[in-house]
Amino acid sequence: MADNDFEGFGIFEEPEGFRPSTPPPKEVLHTRVIVPNGPEEIKLRLVGSHSLWAHYLWNSGIELANYIDKNPDTVRAKKVLELGAGAGLPSIVSAFDGAKFVVSTDYPDPALIDNLEHNVKQYAEIASKISAVGYLWGSNIKEVMSNAGFKDNEVFDILLLSDLVFNHTEHSKLIKSCKMAIEGNPNAVVYVFFTHHRPHLAKKDMIFFDIAQSEGFQIEKILEEKRTPMFEEDPGAPEIRATVHGYKMTIPIPV
């Protein structure tokens, strides 16, 4: 067969519609329940689709942002780190509510970080004190601190985690990152908000706190709010899938 025998057949071309295209990004608005400072509505761009579920604005992130707005002293004049930030709503609210500065992190995937950067930098009044950074849980967090301008002995004051504990294989890495980020700061607080999206795995979700306690953290429940389940058609009791739980974790000074 001659070299040009396949000409016109397009054997290396996928036919139109063969592979679904990635959905385009979409914008959503978050209406703040209380507005200590900044706009009443925060605009967020969500990636069109992503294997790490960053294309949703999760109930836990909304409730964490609401908690910060209701309790702005939580972040005022504090150095704040958000892990698994997604669209970055709690980070943005923290910056508006008076945080000294905020580092908003997610898995180091260009699509995720570009979108996070877009969201956290869209408001000129907070752009200078908030940054978006790729970070892999469990890895050395010193580079994140260095990029934030930390001195050698500086650590974060406040950590924000929303809807991360469902990722059971990553619990130990998350706890390791939390400890590194606040090491030596007796006043630091880690806020952990989540929903049992898979009620039959709720006990596995809570193992996160067992690991945290074994690493020296004290645990306190601070919130329980009912919303609408993220996915109505999912299995499991809707009232469980609709509930957001909020905890705070601290490491007390050794006596």
Swiss-Prot record:
GO biological process assignments: methylation; nicotinamide metabolic process
Disordered as annotated region, ranges: 1-25
Gene3D superfamilies on file: Vaccinia Virus protein VP39 (3.40.50.150)
InterPro entries given in the database record: EFM7 (IPR025784), Methyltransf_16 (IPR019410), SAM-dependent_MTases_sf (IPR029063)
Domain of life: Eukaryota
Protein's cellular compartments: Cytoplasm
Role according to the record: S-adenosyl-L-methionine-dependent protein methyltransferase that trimethylates the N-terminal glycine 'Gly-2' of elongation factor 1-alpha, before also catalyzing the mono- and dimethylation of 'Lys-3'.
Protein family: Belongs to the class I-like SAM-binding methyltransferase superfamily. EFM7 family.
Protein name per its UniProtKB record: Protein N-terminal and lysine N-methyltransferase efm7
